[in-house]
């Protein structure tokens, strides 16, 4: 088991519908949590920027003197037929959902190695199944999810634990904040607080992944 009390964790996307409850659950278990995102609140870090991960490291070391864990809960979505989707929108999703998390991991892993910490990414159920009218979004999430097993093996040599979490549709409000298109009707999703608890349980247990079928 991983001790979470007193550890310094940066949650990227901490103001989001899933990032906020994850941050709250970590705090409830005694972690020192810093929120990172395009507007902070504690660290300004935009995953579209290759320097975002370095900003996370600087922010954590500058305020707490250490970094023990990073949770990436950031993400953007768009809806619509692929043929009708603006290429700029596709690029935006891959920057935020796939390239950005890779750049983030690249920057934070050396510092996490010093504390034998962890890096956790939230990819989601769409990494397991592609849906019509969400093709670029599904592809971007599948890309980062597919990278995690290989990264886990690389990070193990550094003493860093890497995890990939793929919760089913959750009531985060993300569909209502799409950067393009209109969301189709979705069935009722999971409770974000329950999903956050399952994710933090998995972090504490050093689980390498939690597939969509493993969320209650």
Report each predicted region and the residues it spans:
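C-terminal helical subdomain
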Residues: 164-165, 180-216
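Active-site helix of classical SDR
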Residues: 105, 140
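Conserved glycine-rich cofactor-binding loop
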Residues: 15
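Substrate-binding pocket helix/loop in short-chain dehydrogenase/reductase
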Residues: 81-82, 89-91
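Residue(s) in the substrate-gating loop at a strand-loop-helix junction
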Residues: 124
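Active-site loop immediately N-terminal to the catalytic Tyr-X3-Lys motif
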Residues: 83, 131-135
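Conserved NAD(P)H cofactor-binding loop of Rossmann-fold oxidoreductase domains
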Residues: 73-78
């Amino acid at each position: 088991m991983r001790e979470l009390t007193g550890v310094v964790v940066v949650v990227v996307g901490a103001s989001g519908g899933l990032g906020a409850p994850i941050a709250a659950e970590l705090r409830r278990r005694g972690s020192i949590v810093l929120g990172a995102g395009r507007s902070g609140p504690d660290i300004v870090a935009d995953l579209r920027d290759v320097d975002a991960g370095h900003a996370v490291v600087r922010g954590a070391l500058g305020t707490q003197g250490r970094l023990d864990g990073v949770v990436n809960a950031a993400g953007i979505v768009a809806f619509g037929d692929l043929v009708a989707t603006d290429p700029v929108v596709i690029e935006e999703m891959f920057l935020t959902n796939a390239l950005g998390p890779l750049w983030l991991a690249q920057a934070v892993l050396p510092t996490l190695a010093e504390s034998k910490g962890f890096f956790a990414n939230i990819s989601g159920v769409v990494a397991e199944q592609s849906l019509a009218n969400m093709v670029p979004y599904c592809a971007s999430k599948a890309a980062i999810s597919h990278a995690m097993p290989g990264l886990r093996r690389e990070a193990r040599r550094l003493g860093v634990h890497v995890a990939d979490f793929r919760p089913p549709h959750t009531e985060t409000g993300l569909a209502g904040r799409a950067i393009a298109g209109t969301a189709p009707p979705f069935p009722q999703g999971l409770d974000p607080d329950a999903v956050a608890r399952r994710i933090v349980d998995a972090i504490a247990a050093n689980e390498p992944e939690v597939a969509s079928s493993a969320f209650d």
